[in-house]
Amino acid sequence: MMRIGGVSGWLRSAAITGAAGIPMSTHLYPEISAHVMRVTETAHWLEWQDWPDPILTEPFQLKEGKIIVPDKPGQGIEWNEKAVAKFAMK
């Protein structure tokens, strides 16, 4: 996401690759990537890590090898404030 220009850059690239029939995959940031892959015509693989799970109130769920994308506003995630506080720099 960060090297393609964020969500807007992804959508521009997805339009080009979709027209050419070229598959697109993501690298890192599954909490964002899951959403853009849902609207990518040639979505291929979503790279998955569970790294953010300890700091989310409701970690993403997988079913039959596929992510269940939250339908909540924004990114669909909510931070566990107590868990996040453990990692704060003081």
Language-model features: where?
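C-terminal extensions of enzymes
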Residues: 56-90
